[in-house]
Structures are given as structure tokens and as C-alpha cells.
Amino acid sequence: MRINRYLRLFAAALVLFFAGVVYAWSILKAPLGEEFGWTPAALALNFTITMCAFATGGLVSGLLAKKVPAQLRVAIGGLLGGGGIAAVSFLSGEAILLLYLLYGILAGFSIGMVYNTGITTPTGWFPDKTSLSSGVVMMAFGFSTLVLGKVLQAMFDSPAFGWRKSYLLLGIGVVVVSLLTAPLIRTPKPGEVPPAAAKKATPGENFPPLGMMKRISFYGLFFVCTFQAAVGNTMISFAKDFSLSLGASASLAVTLVGLLSVCNGVGRLISGALLDKLGLRKTQYIMALVLMTAALSGLAGVLAESLVLGVCALVLCGFSYGFCPTFSAAATLHFYGGAHYPLNLSIINMTLIPTSFMATLAGGLVESSGGYLGVFLVLTLAALLASVVNLCLKKA
């Protein structure tokens, strides 16, 4: 039976929606700190470990792409990742190293495998809509924190569940969804892609990983993705406190954090549509404009103590952050071809490692200076550098 390619896209989006919960650490960590007395710094370290393992898992998935079927990578990644999350429910207060091992390393690494597979596989079914298909699954991944995060928060507060049962059910959910969707997530066989779609595909020159890494454009792309993601990731890390500093009420600050997440998800879909409609070059100009406007709005908001400008900065940072993964996927495919796409993209996604440390450094700057002026000066400089380099990226 021929399965519609949109059903396969839905399967990839669904598994990434559940896998994306690994990013909801700001919510998932709360009951652990309360029950075990683990410090914010110790819990923050777990997220850094998670991001490093996530990027490494994506790299391993890329290395295995030509040897291990996508279905098997999703199934194994989901099984181990969900198992790691579920195992956290059995932790005691003396076992923070086990938290790092189970959630940080095991779940982070395994879900990184699922992410790489879920992002790269749909493009084979949509050669006519590569960026839009990537944007759809990336939006699902981004919305996970907002939707599942709220569900988990309610479960934590409910006497019927509590944090232990919530972690257990979450892990089981990741396992079940991964195993159910895995059979649908595979690369197309010859003749399976609709002829009308295949005709629109425009394959370019194919670069193997080492060939890609010999190109100056690779380092430019890595730089752009690192600094653009750093701006968004940093803003996410202090969005609530930043809003409060500009006079927002506690409830409004929480709402604005949610709004930033929504914009992040929508930005992934919009950027995918723009990339397919306008092409890479024109989208790069839009991307640079949004990033610079976001950083300058935040800086102006701090200087003028304006909540309105602060809200603009949060919204635009969300959109800008959403552009980043879709752009990196499209640029990798456009510059370096599809023959080695899963592995090449996993190498580009190693930007997650330096990015995860930048948000921590920004938090230290806020703490030491007692305000956000220094941070936004740094973010504006980072945005400027990323935008300039981005506009210089024209070919492989």
C-alpha cells in the first residue's frame, strides 16, 4: 500500500513533538530542585550536558544514516530517550550524577538521534518543498516545550500525578510514539516520490563532510548559526526576568515567555515557506533584518525602560530563533547537496554546544552587573556580526 507522503511528514512531526520535551528543562527541573535541594547551578549544568549530548547524538545518527535505516534509528533513539526520562522518576536526592547520566547523556544523546533523523528524512519525500517540510517538523519540535510543558506543569501540581508519575508517563509516551511512528519515517525508494514533485527538485553539487569542512562557507555558516541561535537562546533563558525588570506583572511575564515560544515555532514554519518561495538569498536578507531589529529593540527597551519595546524584542527574538534551524537545514542542503545531507547537517548542528554555554555566560553577566544593558550590548554585537557574515554567504 502506497502511504501518502504527508502522512509520513505528520509522523515525523509527531515524534519530534514528543522528543522536543527535552528542551522543557526549565519546567522539568523545578520539582527536582524543590524535593532534593539541588542548586540552580547544578540543574543548569544538566541542561548544558543535555545539549552537548543532543548534538553528539545527531552527529552519530548522521554517521549511521547510510548503514542503519531511519526507522531503526527513530525506534532505538525513542526507546532509549524515553527510558532515560522515565528512569528519572526513581531518583533519590543523593543521585544527581544519575540525573546527568539518565537525562543529560542518555536522553539527550538518544533524542538527538531522533531529531537528526526526523529532520532530514522528510526532505527526501518533498524535494519540491524541502524547507517547508523541514519547517513543519521543526515547528512541532519547538511547540513541544509550550504545549507539553504546560501539561507537565499541571501534572506536577496535581496530587493524582506528582513529578515522579509525570516523569514516568512522559518517558513512556516518548517510547510509545517513537515506536508507532518509526515505520513511517524512512527515506523514499526510487519511484516513490511523485513525478511532479521530483521535477521541481534542483540538486546541486554534493560535498562529503570533509569536503564541506574545507570550504570557507562552512565556517561562515557555522558562525552565523552559532551567534544567531545564541541571541535567541539567551533571550529564552531570561525572558521572564527581563519582562519583570521592565514592569510586567508576574502573569504577563509568564504569558510573554509562552508568546516567545509560539513565535519560535511559527518562525520555523514561516522561514521554511519563505525559503521555498523566495529562495535562500532573499530569505537571508529577511533573516538579518529580523535578527538586528530584535537585538536593537531589546537594547532600546533597556535604555528607555520600555515594556512595549521589550515585548517587541521578545517576539522578534522568537521569530529569529525559529529561522535558525530551518535556515541551517536549507543552507546545508543548498550549498553541499543531498548525498551526505544527514551527516553534514549533524555537523552544522554542533553549534548547539557553544550556544548552550553562551546563555550561561549571559546569565552570569546579568548577575554580576545587576541589569540587562551589558547583555544586550553583547547580543547586538553578536547579531551584527552574524548578519554581516550571513549576507556574505552566497555559494559553497
Task: Report each predicted region and the residues it spans.
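Helix-loop-helix hairpin linking two adjacent transmembrane segments in secondary transporters
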Residues: F141-T187
